[in-house]
Amino acid sequence: MKKILALIISCSIIMSFLPMSVYGAINSQDMVKKMGIGMNLGNTFDAPTEGSWSKAAQEYYFDDFKQAGFKHVRIPIRWDQHTLANSPYTVDSNFLNRIETVIDWSLSRGFVTVINSHHDTWLMDNYSQNIGRFEKIWEQIAQRFKGKSENLVFEILNEPHGNITDSQINDMNKRILNIIRKTNPTRNVIIGAGYWNSYNSLSQLEIPNDPNLIATFHYYDPYSFTHQWQGTWGTKNDMDAIAMVFNHVKKWSDKNNIPVYLGEYGVMGHSDRTSAVKWFDFVSDQAISHGFSCGAWDNGVFGSVDNDMAFYNRDTRQFDKEILNAILTTGTTYDWTPPTETNPDPPRTPATPAYGEQLIEDFEGAMQWAAYSGVDATASCKISSGKSNNGLEITYAGSSNGYWGVVDNEHRNQDWEKWQKISFDIKSSNTNEVRLLIAEQSKIEGEDGEHWTYVIKPSTSWTTIEIPFSSFTKRMDYQPPAQDGSETFDLYKVGSLHFMYSNSNSGTLNIDNIKLIGLPEEQIGGKIGDVNEDGNIDAIDFALLKKYLLDSSISINKVNADINLDGDINAIDFAKLKMMLLGD
């Protein structure tokens, strides 16, 4: 019996090293199932040098990982410190040898093994200048490991952020995938979107036509709990918020027919202990129940105020049993009933356009605004001199990872659908960019819905700024877990209005006379809607606009037909004209 067992083990080890052409490829859906729950070997090869951030890799780690019950290991790797800065951008052979040794340790234990490019921020800092070097690095990685089994998975780039744009990320994914496919035609490759692999950015991810792709996102929300040790976690609303995010990702995955890998998630060691265990348990369960694979982040660091995020002690070879159990077992620390499925909001008839303007805030009454900030950023607000009488003065000091903002607590839960624009007077101590943010209402009490923003470049003298609501874009650096995922700015459910940070700079802002702007009053009954220019707005205009939408060669007055003044003539204008004629 012992001989048979030894033979089986030997065969499995040999098969893990067989090249893909011999062993056979595995499609991405099956690969994600095979990956199951895994862990990261963090702070090892993603450090400037191995051992500078955490203990160097040891073969026994993989024995311990396997005994614990993990199915895959993600090995983050920083390549730039081991690559020539100039052409031909050769990767140090000794470093490649070391990486191959560790990959083989992992593969020989039967792990699906993920390697990536990690902390290579030089590419993000100047994409157009550095993409050539990045291509050469991946060409060497792909060539070196082309003979490994299908259990080796490539991940192109960890957490794109900073200067790199969505279009550049999509271009990079296509370029690197083409390079990989020259030597690894069927190997599974993981691609991700921007803003630190945010789930919010998945909608911006262009998916190449390739059957062996896996999409990734990372999850550390709520950040104030997982990284800043603030408060506790584990209420019904806390869990519902995470479930909404994973539902959102699952819908995106199904729509785009691509499986999903939650490549990182974790909580710093100084967070509330009971909450941390419960958070690991719930997030792991949500990932698996949605059909994702997931890899918990572990960096081997214990006791550090800034970097403690580990559950495996590399010296004692002991796991934090509570965290390990929470990650690998289902629902042992929490009770949760999924929220009742709610139907999406029914189709709405567009509101009848408003005319003129409505002043909503002149700062002449009691103070209704409040400041908020965190992570070394600060903000305060007070009533001060405005453009006309009183105004709001905002003093802020940003930080590289911090946030600040001021929120209007009076005008919450508003319906602004009939308005076209928002207007305000603004003056700044400098020309630093700030953002105007409108948060939608949410179906979860106490939570925001989707965030929509517009970047303001204020002057140092009083200026009136008018912003069409159609110019707002979905916030990409963060979205509340309770967002509805509609990708539509729903003005009929405005939750709150904010002025907030756009970068880490500091300064002072003065705000006055916030207004909602409708159609020009001189156009009432005159031009807007008079599609045939006969001086009347009637059923003839309605019929003519309908014909135009079916055949754009028909002659109409396009200025008058653009009912909502967004520059396009479409079904929204048709619906708004109908409401005008009905007098609603």
Curated annotation (Swiss-Prot):
Disulfide bonds: none
Keyword Magnesium: no
Enzyme Commission no: 3.2.1.4
Reactions listed under catalytic activity: Endohydrolysis of (1->4)-beta-D-glucosidic linkages in cellulose, lichenin and cereal beta-D-glucans
Residue ranges of domain Dockerin in the record: 524-584
A GO biological process held by the record: cellulose catabolic process
Domain CBM11: 354-584
Record's keyword terms, sorted: Carbohydrate metabolism, Cellulose degradation, Glycosidase, Hydrolase, Polysaccharide degradation, Signal
Highest rank taxon of the organism: Bacteria
PROSITE patterns named among the record's database cross-references: CLOS_CELLULOSOME_RPT, DOCKERIN, EF_HAND_1, GLYCOSYL_HYDROL_F5
Pathway assignment: Glycan metabolism; cellulose degradation
GO molecular function: beta-glucosidase activity; cellulase activity
Gene3D superfamilies hit by this protein: Dockerin domain, Galactose-binding lectin, Glycosidases
Signal peptide: 1-24
Enzyme class: hydrolase
Active site: E159 (proton donor), E264 (nucleophile)
GO cellular component: cell surface; extracellular region
InterPro entries: CBM11, Dockerin_1_rpt, Dockerin_dom, Dockerin_dom_sf, EF_Hand_1_Ca_BS, Galactose-bd-like_sf, Glyco_hydro_5, Glyco_hydro_5_CS
Chain positions covered by the region annotation Catalytic: 25-328
Functional note: The biological conversion of cellulose to glucose generally requires three types of hydrolytic enzymes: (1) Endoglucanases which cut internal beta-1,4-glucosidic bonds; (2) Exocellobiohydrolases that cut the disaccharide cellobiose from the non-reducing end of the cellulose polymer chain; (3) Beta-1,4-glucosidases which hydrolyze the cellobiose and other short cello-oligosaccharides to glucose.
Family (UniProt): Belongs to the glycosyl hydrolase 5 (cellulase A) family.
Protein name: Endoglucanase D
Gene name in the database record: celCCD
